[in-house]
């Protein structure tokens, strides 16, 4: 069984076991196995997930096979202390995958095993991709503020905190011992980059699949006052500090400045988000209208008198 390695023994061991377990349980059914995300791009840090997509040949032979494929993915989580984000799909059902995942597999993945089918894969339509990018950006924003909905304009999560509440307890995976959690900035960096991706979707026709690609493309195509902020958030927050709080006082001051700027960036995004949702609400597409209505439930926009408006 020929499995491509990425040069990180602990991760390569996990990836090999994933492929072997899928081949053992579904002999002859696996078309390919792809690695996406930070490990595929080569800039993974301590807190990075392992992102894998297992592609079955043709269609799933039954609903049972599809369920077993997903169940196996969950069962493999204990192979690593890191968060294992594993999706299984079939060639016939690829168009039903989330748009961001389809774009990631086609454009920025690494083939670990099997036949390379990426040239035959289609990208999601721009409208679908934009809805997905918007939904993910809002999800991370809500996680960052630890709420189910927000009111525009936002306030800092903790105005009196050293980092305005943007530093939060983080663990390696959902199964990690909560006693091992320590404060970090993973959600902060993730949220900033996801917002950048959504703004790109609003303003351009470019698909991006990774944080680095999002930041670089934002600089290339939008290049506004937030381009340097996003670059610093990615390069310092992820690549330099590995989502951890820096210990050096000078670097902590640098992080505090980034955190201070995060709030106006979030509000900048929410203004663009509202304009996008209103456009969707006025379209003839029923799915777009429903998406907009749901989004307007999660973000409450008030007028100067404090009354709710769309």
Residue ranges of model-derived segments:
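Short, charged amphipathic alpha-helical segments flanked by flexible coils
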Residues: 203-242
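P-loop NTPase catalytic cores that bind/hydrolyze ATP
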Residues: 180-200
